[in-house]
């Protein structure tokens, strides 16, 4: 368990932009239980949860130069004496978020990942990579961060939209993406960390719902809700509001994910009865 404090001040060049505090711990393996799990506070307020998949805090959508933020971090790692490799670190940086860059990145990533899964002679694969090539050829990366660079990103995004995405929108297929987090109640960390992980994960979901009104989420295992109700009643109250809005689905069908090798038949039946 570690605590970190940092006071950060918005520099003049970030005036008016969306500014994030970006954290890097060196963690890259999602299954590595040494990966730090972090609760982040901004000016004394519980603001975000961080891990290897969530690595930034939004400080301001319209930053003001000279404005100072007090950041506090409570970090946990399951590493213990004799096994910790010393590869984890704690580095904090301020960064400007630019929609031109982020939007283009994800639009290109979607095309690349879809095309890469198809056979080499597949027409959709060929069209996808050709669209990406046209897109990349429009980018002016001679001076990263310059006005010309961001303008070229807009042009590339328009090219990808007009010559690739627009042609595929008439497809009658509709896909609904529903968020979910799988939390093992008895995993490779102590139960108290499972309780904190539930709070961290649900706080992340609530923050995403604040940023994206269309976001929907489903989570099962009523025992997790019991933990959050006991440990973070404020978070639990916000979850209830999202459930009322129809944006958060609290699901069963079992009280928690059981171990079917050890549990008796009666135990499994009780899981289902109380879970539903």
Positions of PLM-derived features:
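Carbohydrate-active enzymes and regulators
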Residues: 1-276
């Amino acid at each position: 368990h570690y605590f970190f404090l940092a006071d950060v001040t918005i520099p003049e060049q970030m005036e008016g932009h969306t500014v994030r505090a970006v954290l890097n711990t060196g963690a890259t393996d999602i299954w590595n239980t040494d990966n730090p799990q972090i609760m982040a506070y901004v000016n004394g307020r519980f603001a975000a949860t961080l891990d290897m998949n969530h690595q930034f805090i939004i400080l301001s959508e319209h930053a003001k130069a000279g404005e100072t933020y007090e950041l506090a971090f409570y970090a946990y790692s399951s590493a213990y004496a004799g096994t910790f490799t010393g590869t984890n670190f704690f580095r904090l940086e301020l960064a400007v978020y630019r929609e031109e860059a982020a939007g283009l990145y994800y639009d290109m990533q979607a095309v690349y990942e879809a095309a890469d899964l198809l056979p080499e002679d597949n027409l959709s694969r060929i069209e996808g990579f050709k669209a990406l090539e046209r897109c990349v050829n429009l980018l002016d990366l001679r001076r990263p961060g310059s006005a010309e660079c961001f303008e070229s990103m807009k042009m590339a995004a328009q090219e990808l939209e007009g010559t690739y995405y627009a042609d595929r929108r008439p497809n009658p297929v509709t896909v609904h993406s529903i968020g979910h987090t799988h939390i093992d109640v008895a995993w490779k960390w102590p139960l108290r960390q499972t309780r904190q992980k539930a709070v961290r994960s649900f706080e992340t979901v609530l923050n995403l719902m604040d940023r994206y009104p269309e976001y929907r989420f489903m989570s099962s295992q009523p025992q997790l809700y019991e933990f959050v109700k006991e440990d973070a009643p404020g978070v639990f109250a916000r979850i209830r509001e999202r459930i009322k809005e129809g944006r958060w689905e609290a699901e069963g069908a079992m009280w928690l994910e059981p171990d079917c090798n050890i549990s008796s038949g009666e135990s499994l039946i009780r899981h289902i009865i109380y879970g539903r």
